[in-house]
Amino acid sequence: LRNDLSKSCAPHSVRVTKLCGLERYAYVQHLVSVITGRLATGKSALDVLESAFPGGSITGAPKVRAMQIIAELEQTARGAYCGSLAYVGFDGACDSSILIRTITAAGGHWQFPVGGGIVADSVPAAELEETWHKAEGMLRAM
């Protein structure tokens, strides 16, 4: 994300103010980083969203090649899952969220996709267990 923000921010203004802070929730834990920057002249919050989308925590890295691999391997569209919900205020303020843990309904069917990132040292059984942990909170909510 730091690299993505550099495309829309003033030179040398992008800062990582929090790196991989652990946030605990009922069924999952997330590593959360905070990255800030000052908009470059002529850039807007929409430029930031465009350069940052899709989120690297969803695609993997390097982002462009990871997206090519996802397109080659995934046989169905993700729909809202792993997309983004955002707002941009009239004052230029912006906030966004990647749609994971999201239930959608269409045609009388409800769904909530879950998954995990696969990396070189992934353990398949542990990835499956993590996926079930992610699903558990959604299942209980339904």
State where each predicted segment sits:
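Conserved hydrophobic core element of enzyme catalytic domains
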Residues: 25-142
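Gly/Ser/Thr-rich active-site loops/lids in small-molecule metabolic enzymes
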Residues: 14-30
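Short secondary-structure junctions
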Residues: 11-16, 40
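Short acidic, Gly/Ser-rich segments with clustered Asp/Glu that frequently serve as metal-coordination loops
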Residues: 1-8, 21-25
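Short acidic, glycine/serine/threonine-rich loops at helix termini
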Residues: 7-10, 123-125
